């Protein structure tokens, strides 16, 4: 996708948000400054604070979920919204400020030769590092998915990614909502559907608000869940998408 085709395609930024009143307005405003022509949908995933109100005031469209469904459930809403309205590209951006809007253009240009472009924290740009069980899980997932996708993937759990028309059609039909399903199982689905996946290096910023969920216990749980999510994803069979169209 060249710089001219970025503006010719209909792009929807989908931003899952749960109790992100401290950061969501700022992130929306930053995205709009970088890409003023794109549309932005904040999916309020059952927040009990002013996330929806502040996102709307900042200029985003807002879809409110009655209960918390997790990132997968929020993104499923976003993909169905995009498919119903004829968007060509969906870009997932976190509402906590960790994903730098200045990297969006590179993600979009990556769709020139791919159906899914993952923004990787571990591809040689920036100083982000994982440690402990979380690191081991990410390394193991990287090895498995690099073999499955036949390309090097260093950050398969990244939530910063761009997806083209074939990915939108696939994920609007079904998008996993289980923990880690939105990253691990969705990539297995994409590989089985013969979608092309690649990654680009990105810089990850500090959270603008809220509290990170890392601790030794949670990291150990993450390792176990990552392995289980991968096992379930490989066992399950999901509907494929017509792969006759170009990326």
Residue locations for each model-derived region?
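A conserved acidic beta->alpha catalytic loop
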Residues: 44-52, 97
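Acceptor/aglycone-binding surface of glycosyltransferases and processive sugar-polymer synthases
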Residues: 65-84, 101-180, 206-224, 238-247
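Donor nucleotide-sugar binding loop of glycosyltransferases
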Residues: 20-23, 47, 100
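Short, well-formed alpha-helical segments that are part of the catalytic scaffolds
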Residues: 19-33
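Cell-envelope/extracellular polymer assembly enzymes that use nucleotide-activated donors
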Residues: 10-12, 185
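Short beta-strand-to-loop acidic/aromatic patch adjacent to the donor-nucleotide binding site
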Residues: 87-98
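Catalytic donor-sugar/metal-binding loop of nucleotide-sugar-dependent glycosyltransferases
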Residues: 152, 177-178, 187-205
């Amino acid at each position: 996708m060249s710089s001219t085709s970025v503006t010719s395609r209909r792009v929807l930024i989908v931003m899952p948000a749960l109790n992100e009143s401290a950061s969501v307005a700022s992130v929306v405003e930053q995205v709009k400054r970088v890409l003023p022509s794109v549309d932005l949908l904040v999916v309020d995933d059952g927040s009990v604070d002013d996330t929806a109100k502040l996102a709307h005031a900042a200029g985003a469209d807002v879809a409110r979920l009655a209960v918390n469904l997790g990132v997968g459930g929020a993104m499923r809403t976003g993909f169905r919204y995009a498919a119903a309205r004829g968007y060509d590209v969906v870009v997932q951006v976190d509402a906590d400020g960790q994903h730098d809007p200045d990297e969006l253009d590179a993600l979009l240009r990556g769709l020139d030769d791919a159906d899914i472009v993952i923004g990787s924290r571990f591809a040689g740009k920036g100083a982000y590092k994982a440690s402990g069980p979380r690191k081991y899980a990410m390394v193991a997932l990287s090895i498995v998915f690099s073999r499955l996708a036949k390309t090097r993937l260093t950050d398969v759990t990244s939530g910063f990614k761009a997806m083209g028309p074939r990915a939108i059609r696939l994920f609007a039909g079904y998008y996993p909502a289980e923990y880690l399903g939105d990253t691990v199982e969705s990539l297995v689905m994409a590989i089985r559907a013969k979608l092309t996946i690649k990654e680009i290096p990105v810089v990850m910023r500090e959270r603008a608000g809220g509290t990170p969920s890392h601790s030794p216990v949670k990291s150990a749980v993450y390792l176990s869940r990552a392995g289980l999510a991968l096992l379930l994803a490989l066992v399950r069979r999901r509907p494929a998408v017509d792969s006759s169209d170009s990326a």
